[in-house]
Amino acid sequence: MLGYRPYLIVRCSPLALLIIHLLLRIVHSQPTAIIDLLLFNSVALTAALSAYFSPLLKERFARISIALAIVFWALGSTFSTWDAFFSDYFPSALSDIAYTAFYPLLLFGLFRTLTLHPMKRNEIKGEIIDTLIIGFGVSGLCAGLALKSAMTNFEGSALSVFLSIVFPVGDVILVAVTISLLALQRGNLRNFLFLLGITIFTATDIYFLWQSSISTYAFAAITDDGWLIGLIVISES
């Protein structure tokens, strides 16, 4: 683990970079590679480092899983943002895979952060696993049923439309599981922070999807920083 001063630098870096990004975005309204590719994704990557070295996360696999989840999201963002600025395109499947990997990794990390007594953890482990299975099953079924009708309202291939449904469904699952853990752990403060981060991230996702559906989304909008704020709060939990 890092010493106190190095960790303090790592921990403060995401927020400092976010503030710089917001200020530059206000000054420069037009998208630029430095602000929206390099700086934007640097916030997410430093948030991943902060989560990995966090002394609050005593469970090693929880740190690794949460950090990897944020790294994969940052990779997905980097791939898609790169394509917006340069002619050398990354295959869209790369960003889709990276974004999709965010959800199971974050769910696994959330489960591993349980701070309950080991005996109590064993008692509720089966309940959480059942909840995850049911949640993913119902979500997958709903996404499949919605796919046909969504094709008439969203542009793009069947895969892109399906992913546009799966991503917010994944957000909802994360919120639901976090709320369940809050109830099981009687309002653990870390889970409140996790819920806040997931809620901010989810709200940004839904807002992005809504704007995209009515063709009003503007690339590199200041509202995109909601994703970064959510990830920073998650890394602090």
Segments from the language model and where they lie:
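Polytopic alpha-helical membrane-helix bundles and their juxtamembrane interface segments
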Residues: 1-237
